[in-house]
Structure formats: structure tokens, C-alpha cells
Amino acid sequence: MSARSAYLCQIQICNGFLIAAGLLAVGLAGSQFSKVGLDNYRDIDFRLLNFIHVVTGCIGFYSLWRNHGSIVTKSLYLVSFVIGFATAVFYGFTTYRVVKAGENLNQLQSADGFNEEFQSENSNYAGRIVISALMIASGAVASLFSLFAIFLLSKIIVVTIPVYPLQSREQELAMSSAKKTLASIGLIKFILAFGILGLCVFIEYEHENVAGQDKYIKIGLDHISAMLCIVSGAMDIWATKGKNQQNLNLKVALAVAVVAATWCLKTVDNNAMPFYKNDLKFYYQGREVGDPSITSTDAPRYILVVAHGVLLGCFGIAFFLSTLSAVIVGTYLHLDFHSMHTEVNKSIKIQTGVLNVLHVFWGACMLALCILGLLDTWWRGEFLGADLLWVSVLFMTTGLMTSNNYSVMITTKFILSVVCLGISVEKMCASANLIYQMAAYPAYRNGNDRTFVAQIILYSIQAGIYLLEALTSLAGSYLYGTELRKQPNLTYRHSNGVHGLFSLGTLFYAVVITGTYIVFELGKWRYNEIPIEVPFFRLGNGPLAGAVFIVQFLCIPFPSLLASASILNIIIASISLFTVSSAITNVYYLQRYLQASDLLPTTETQQTIYQVAIILAAGAALACVICTVCAIICSLRSSYILHHRSTSPDSTVVAPLGEEQFGSGTLRVGTHMRTPSRPFHPQQSPAGGGVQPMEEQSVYWSADENPFYYHTSKRFYGKPYQIESGFYGYALAGSGSGQPGQSPANVGDDPNRMVQSSASQTQIGHVFNN
């Protein structure tokens, strides 16, 4: 067996173990509906979250079978590594708590009536320990084999011609500066994320100190966000080292940075509301009664308030850094002759500046409202500022984020504008509902008049800011979408069928999450029932998923939006992956509540509400899984299309050589160099003539994403040129002015000609069967 075949078998074994570990975790998620269910379901549970391992393994099998998709595959391996590791640690602590709870229960065996009350409970502890131990094994196996697969993947992606192109001095300086900046941002993010992870652990410890007997992990998702940020920082640093797979690693770094940024921002949302809000509420209540055990500087409640506030700020910084690193990677990947010399239209500059100022201003207004809502003032009433922190960070980041590369700038602005538009519309509608409820609900209307008026004013200001931000984002989406539409489309095919089919999963998620939001709000205000512990529908951002679906649909007439749609799919997949744990946790909670309904006094209406709630929560969990899978497939397909270039009179793409057909699965490797055999005479090609002497022409393969189409580089005397690149961006033209009468023999003596052309190319190794 060749080394290539051995690596191929090993990575397929890793994919098999990932699928098995994911299926085991999903199967154990169903055990919660039995008598041996774990007791940590009320706060957070990670079992269903591990379905991502199944997706990773299947995508890994597919990418090796089809010989493309290395960007998505490697990114998924990194995400599976983080989630598997976090799951193993999470259930390690859960196992310890289950054992301690069993020991405490055994101490009561001598008490009267123990067998009647706790015998069934006590007999289930062995099964709970087994479930928790299996989850440790599942997470550890997934983490370990994901790590193996990452390194094995680098073994089967090989460089066929390890010669690197020489750049102009200007491009060399730009690339060197981008590398240093990316490495610096990655290092800062890496160190900051380690500190954030330690702070997350500390806050869980402090929550345990004030939790009484309920000592299970409460938040959990913030640990995963910090780990993703660590991996993203490490990937940024790794991508700046080495050359053989540098462009692949850069694109993986971009994808992981988008995932980390999304999780960090949603962590601010999840932690601030309800966890930080509850910490502040308990602290204010203790201060009101003058309890020194709460208000003293060494009290757990005081420490929690301070530490949790710092944690939220750190996650906001991590979101900004992750977004910035993604923009830097995009800028680096577009450092070609054309992009570096594209001038931004003056009107676009002015409009961009105005929109940036507006985004920052609306974000600052939201931050001010957030602080007002967190202060202990009597007149704010039920106005809560905790859920405004993450949107203020998002709005200000949208205004501050930019790039000196025109293509990257308009792509970044378009993506962030679409995200802000979806979020603003959702929050504006929710704020309008709160204004109506505050004005009409008897409990508020009959209360203190000043508080009644003040909270309506605060919610009205909040709704107004969301409306203005939505209009600003709509203007930005139209402006930058129009500019993107004007960009040249270099793809030779569109995948309307695949994208159309799987984008329905995103639409399904949008409808389910938005509908769940409406129904639960109706139950809260009309029937005074809140049947869930964690408002997962608020985390899911259904209208944003609807906006992503619309952008994906617009890729049919405007294929130049495909790159933006791909990143938006990564964002919505990350959000749905973040939400699935909270959704299934509420299913577990409602199921236990319905089982105990014979012990709890409930009316028929309440029973109906709880039955509807568990159906909606289960449907939302299913929608999260479907959306994650469909969005990943859409991104995979978009990556495939984006790395195939179109043929045109001005294109350097040529058809496959020989008798090879597209999709045949074989590929001959070689390089063809050709130079003129006769010296050039100026009278043979007058100025402005249609035929010019060619200095050289190289035929090479564009990338592992495009193994069946080739590119040629064409260099004419005295003319700058640009190589049209596929996956690995082989581009550079050096400028030089050839003199009339110059021949190929003395071209190398021209001092103005600073560069030569060459190319390196990567392929998945197992496609070569020569």
C-alpha cells in the first residue's frame, strides 16, 4: 500500500469514528426521556450539540470521494475538536456531581420512609453514571479523531510544483504587512481567549458557591465560545507560517474566525440575558435590605457581578478581533494587481463614511440604553438593558470594520449590513410588542405613574433606534449589494438546484424560530404563562435566517453575491448550532414538568400551553439541526462553484488537455513552458496591433477545488499582466516598459522588469493514479 493510500484509509477511519461518536451522543440525548435521565437538563445540555460530529464525518467522506471541499472539511474538523473536548470536560464534572448526589442520597437510607420516597431514584444512579461516562468517551473520541484528521488532511494535500511566484515590491510589502497584522491579531486573540476561558471557569465556580444543592454547570456555552476563539487565534498564526498550504489555511482561518465571532457575540447575548441580569437582581435585592453577605467586596454575589460584567466586555472584544482577523484574511487573499490598484468611487466613499457614522452612533445609543437598564433606578421599571449589549457591539463593529481593499470592503459591509438588518427588524418588532403590552397590561397600567411612563419612553426610544438602524442597514445592504452585483462573475456554472433545495432548510428554521417567538410571547402576555427556562427563540434570530435565505435566492440572478451568501450561511449555521442546546434543554424541562403534572396543580389551559410549548421546543431543536446541516452544504457547494473559473475571450482558463473529461477522476500532472523561437522585430507587430509576441506561457492547475480546468499565464513584452487564479490566487504582474526592438534574449537585462512568473499548485494527493 502506498503512503497516499495509507493516509486515505486513516482519514476515512477518523471520519467513521466521528460519525459513531456523534450518533452515540444523539442516542444518549434520547435517554433523558427515560427514568435514568441526568439532572442537569434544566440549565444546559450538550448531548444533541454533538450531532455536529456526524455532519463532520459525512462531509469528510464526501470531500475525499469528490476531491474537493478541503476548506469546509478542515473547518469542521476544528469545530468538532472544540465541541468534543468541551463535551468531555462538561460531562466529567457532571459525572462527579451525579456521584456526589448518589452518596448524599445513600446517607439518608436509614431515615424513615426512605424506600417509599427515594428507592426508585436511588436505583437509577448507576444508569446516570453510565450515560455521563459514555458522553465523556464520545466527546474524547470525537476530539481525538478530529485532531488526527486535521493532520492527516495536510498529508493528502500536496504541492505538485513547489515554486513560489515572485511579487512586485509593492505586493511583497502589502503581503508582509498583512501577515504581520494577522499574526499579531491572532496572538492577541489567542492570549485573550485563554483569559476568557479561565474567567468562565471562575464564574461557574462562583455560581456554584451561591447555588445551594444545584451545583451543575449553568452556562456552558461560553466555554465553547472561548475555546473556538483560542482555535481561531491559533489558526490565524498557523496560516501565516509556511507556503505549501498557506492559501488553504488562510481560508480555513477565515471560516473559523467567522464561527468564533458568531459564537462570541451570541455568548454576550446568552450570558447577559438572563444570567447577568439575575446576578444583578440578586445583588440589588441584597443591597436594598443591607445584607453584608451580598454587598461586601468579598461576597460571592458582588464578585459575580463584577467578574461577569468583565467577561461580557471581553467577549465583545473577542468578537471584534475575530471579525477583524476575518477581514484581514480576506484582504490578504485579494492582494493581486487588479485589487491593489482599484480606486474606490468618491460617492461610495462618502456614502460609506455616512453609514459608518450612523452605525456607530446607533450602537452608542444602544450602549447608553443598556447601561440605563442595568442601573438600579426605581423609574426604569421592567426595562431591561442586558439584551441590548450584544446589539450595540454588533452595530458599532459594523461601522468600524473596513478594509483598504475595495472588493473586501464592499463584501464585509454587505454581510454586516444584512446581519444588522435581520437583527434590527426582529428587535424592533419585539420592542413594539413590549410598548403595547406595557401600555395595556393591567399590572403596569395600575402601578406607579412615573414608572409606567418612564418604561414606555425607554422602550419607545429602543424601538426608534432599532427602526433607524434597520433603515441604515437596508441602505447599506442595497448600496453594497449593488456594488457587488457589478463585480465580474468568474464562475462558469450556477448551482440553483442544490442551493435552492438546501436553502429551504434555512427558510424552515426562520419560520419555526420566528413562529415560536410569537407563540411564546402570546402565552406570556395573554395567559400569563412562561413555560420555559431559557428563551431559546430569542437566541435563534429567525428573521436573520430569512434574510440569509433571500440573499441565497438572489444568487441565482446575481452570482457575484455567492461569496457573501457563503459567509452568511456560515453565520446562520453557527447561530443555529449555538441555539440547539438551549432548545433541547427546554424540551427536557417541559417533559419533566408534564410527567409531574399529577403532583402539581394545573388547569386544563395550562396543560394545553405546556403541551404546545414542548412541541414548539422540539420543533425548534429539529429546525436548528436541519438549518446547520443545510447551511453547511450550501457553503460547501458555494466553495466548489467559487473555485471554478469561467471561460471568456479575456480569460486565461483553458479546457482540459488531451482526452480527459471533466469529472473523470484522473489528472496528468505537468508544466508546459513555451518561449518564442525567433527574436522579435518591431515591424512584425505595430503598436496597437492585435498580435503581440509572447514571452512565456505556463499551463497549470488552479487548485484542489478545481482539478479539471487549467489556467495559463500570459506575459507580453512591455505590458503588465495578471494571472486569473482559481483556489490559490496565483496572481501577480510586475510592471515594466519594454523598449521597441527588444528581443527575448535581452529581456532579462531590462532593469524595469522586476519580476518573473511562476506558479505553485495544490491537489488532493489521491487523485493521481499515474
Curated annotation (Swiss-Prot):
Instruction: List, as start-end ranges, the regions of compositional bias called Polar residues.
Output: 754-770
Residue numbers spanned by region Disordered: 736-770
Q: The organism sits in which domain of life?
A: Eukaryota
Protein's UniProt name: Uncharacterized protein R07B1.9
- The species this protein belongs to is Caenorhabditis elegans
